[in-house]
Amino acid sequence: MGFLPIKPILPINPIHAQDTNRVLLHVDGSTFFIDNEYFGDRISGYTLPGFVLQPKMEWVFDAHRDVKLKGGLHWLYYWGAQDFPARTAYGAYPLYDSMSRPMHVLPWLQASIKFNSKLKLYLGCLDPDGHDLPLPLYSPELALVGDPETGFQIKFNGNWLKMDIWTDWREYIWNRSPVPERFTAGASGRLVLNHKDWQFYLPLHFVVQHEGGQNMSVSHNINNNFNAAAGLGLYSLIGENFYYDISCRAFWYHQHGNPAVPFSTGWGLYPEVKTCLYNRWILSASYWHGKDFVPLMGCWHFSNLSANTAGLTFDRTRVVTLQASWMKSYPTWPRKCHLVIYGTLYHYLPSTGTFADGTTKDYGHRNQFAVGAALNFYPSIKLF
């Protein structure tokens, strides 16, 4: 679950009145190789070699209000995979399932409308941008190899407030279904104070995962898990080739309902320094200190619950994270393709683990690392 900038911030082509009924073909995708070298009782390592492809047609229904309809397919493939789990939603690393299918292909459909210059609504597949969530709340691998988020999304981009509110429906419930409904909802934003050379901001994040439903024919246990974070940040742009971003966030975890993990409430603290050089290099350093914290969509290195050893918990999770990535966009194919190479080092500080049977084990310093490369492409062709 390393640092992987999936898609750069790109200028958006302006929509003009004459673009009504315009039809375009988009071919968004990425071919990637990710090697997560993780060892020990906390999290297992894994390798992700493959590609994701999203061919889509876009119809500009009303250029005045920027009303668009996009439809296509989402295709994920791992090199060497003979079959794919059929009964699970795909996250960063899907679980094995005895029921399989020869490929993993999903429909992709999105309708969007822009109410004004600041407010936009998405229905269907959501914007795959990570919702501006920090690493403990969102693993960037989800934007690459996870199933598309589906539901609704509202984005507000004002001068002093930026907000993303969404619901991602993961499991639909049928009448008399033995499977409960599952969805994730969240709100992520920041209050900003702009100056000529810097920006002071207050980041606010909230994520809830719900499992249950109102099917009266079948009894479902209801469980809600919450992540939240708030903090302070300072962003400064120095010239055209350098910026730095300093922030500190406090995190909160809470579980309500049928217990699925041994923690009811937990917390974490996460200071981070990030810089970008010449629009190529992104470097960051951070420190995490957490107790009884479980990341719902985030990087599992920050969890106090083991991902590979049932019932194992840690009294404290303290992690120093160093990240570096290099990006290259090719001017011969502007705004259509870029290469990313990255590496992440996680240094664990000593902690004590407690197993399900009550026995304890002391863990010393340990290093884990992840490296990867991705060639991201998103050409567009105007059909008529």
What label would you give each PLM region?
Residues 28-30, 50, 108, 160-166, ...:
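Exposed, low-structure sequence patches enriched in small/polar residues
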Residues 34-36, 80, 130-133, 213:
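Short acidic/His/Gly/Ser-rich catalytic and metal-binding motifs that mark active-site loops
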Residues 65-67, 119, 161, 281:
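Secondary-structure transition into beta-strands, especially the periplasmic turns and strand N-termini
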Residues 120-190:
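Surface-exposed coil loops of outer-membrane beta-barrel proteins
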